[in-house]
């Protein structure tokens, strides 16, 4: 068999061998693509089965419906500073739930009774505690001794309100302490007042002609520097500190930009730039760090890959004022560049 294959190889021409090699590569690629599609389909089926299983859980084990009054009363029991205010048998019955006002009155009266029983116990420590206090034993007796230092206020309908007011005042004091110590940091808010400008008419026409274009935002204004029009640089720098707003990227685009921070070969986000002559250019948006001699750096967005063509076509030069808008067309990031009147007139000549 080996000799037969060797004889066949001898008769094959060089072009035939190349064709056979390319065919093998194509077959391998097709097999890999088929396996990837099968794996993706299998994962999708598994995820759908898991989701369906989660839905069936609550069908087999329905959640128990509870009255809002019961939940509210249980929460009050947890935050109560007195362990003997409410008896364990004081939970509302069906009739009490139907008439919550009567039940609340009974609850308030039980609070007064419990408070009076505590006072009597403190005045006569040798006497036996009431039945409700006996449930808690020695711990309740110890707590009653400490409670004499701060007796309940009879002006309130129930000592539970004291607990709620104490928690509220405690939180308020904590907030005031953080403010005095400078622990509260204010978030950086984009100056949206500067962006309250009507969309230019030429941009409205461009978006209308492009179809499905929407969400125009004024994001950047700049007087061009020498580096912005230098052909060797081939970029427009947009420092973060000079951005009017920084919400023009989607979550996926932001992830791509952030992952490029530590990469030497940055991928960037592809975009379209439209000038006032309605001419479209393909550009790339990347994030760079501008390092200084002091060791500290500043971040900026940069429009590259085609910026030199835009500078040449629009005759941009140092000192020209430009305004940059962003919008979306079929989900694609787009920019619109508006020039100052003088540079635009020179460009149209």
Curated annotation (Swiss-Prot):
Gene Ontology cellular component annotations, sorted alphabetically: nucleus
Highest taxon of the lineage: Eukaryota
Primary location group: nucleus
Pfam entry (one): At2g31720-like
Residues in the DNA-binding region annotation: 240-341
Keyword Nucleus: yes
Record keywords, A-Z: DNA-binding, Nucleus, Transcription, Transcription regulation
CDD domains: B3_DNA (cd10017)
GO MF annotation list: DNA binding
PANTHER family the UniProt entry points to: B3 DOMAIN PLANT PROTEIN-RELATED (PTHR31541), TF-B3 DOMAIN-CONTAINING PROTEIN (PTHR31541:SF34)
Protein name: B3 domain-containing protein At5g24050
Source species of the chain: Arabidopsis thaliana
């Amino acid at each position: 068999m080996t000799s037969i294959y060797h004889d066949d190889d001898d008769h094959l021409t060089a072009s035939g061998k190349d064709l056979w090699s390319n065919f093998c590569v194509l077959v391998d690629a097709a097999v890999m693509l088929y396996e990837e599609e099968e794996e993706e389909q299998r994962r999708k089926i598994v995820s759908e089965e898991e989701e369906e299983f989660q839905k069936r859980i609550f069908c087999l084990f329905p959640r128990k419906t509870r009255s809002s009054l019961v939940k509210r009363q249980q929460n009050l029991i947890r935050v109560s500073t007195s362990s003997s205010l409410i008896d364990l048998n004081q939970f509302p019955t069906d009739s009490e739930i139907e008439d919550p006002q009567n039940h609340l009155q009974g609850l308030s009266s039980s609070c007064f009774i419990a408070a009076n029983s505590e006072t009597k116990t403190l005045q006569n420590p040798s006497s036996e505690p009431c039945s409700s206090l006996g449930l808690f034993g020695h711990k309740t007796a110890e707590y009653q001794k400490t409670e004499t230092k701060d007796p309940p206020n009879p002006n309130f309908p129930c000592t539970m309100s004291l607990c709620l007011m104490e928690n509220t005042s405690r939180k308020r004091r904590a907030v005031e302490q953080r403010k005095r110590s400078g622990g509260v940091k204010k978030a950086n808010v984009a100056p949206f007042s500067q962006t309250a400008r009507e969309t230019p008419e030429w941009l409205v026409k461009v978006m209308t002609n492009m179809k499905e274009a929407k969400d125009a935002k004024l994001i950047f204004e700049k007087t061009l520097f020498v580096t912005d029009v230098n052909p060797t640089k081939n970029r427009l720098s947009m420092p973060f500190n000079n951005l009017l707003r920084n919400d023009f990227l989607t979550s996926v685009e932001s992830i791509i930009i952030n992952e490029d921070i530590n990469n030497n070969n940055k991928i960037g986000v592809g975009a379209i730039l439209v000038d006032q002559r309605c001419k479209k250019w393909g550009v790339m948006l990347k994030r760079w760090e501008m390092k200084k001699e002091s060791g500290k750096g500043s971040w900026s967005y940069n429009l590259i890959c085609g910026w030199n063509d835009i500078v040449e076509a629009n005759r941009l030069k140092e000192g020209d004022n430009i305004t940059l808008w962003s919008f979306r067309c079929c989900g694609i990031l787009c920019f619109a560049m508006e020039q100052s009147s003088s540079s635009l007139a020179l460009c149209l000549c």
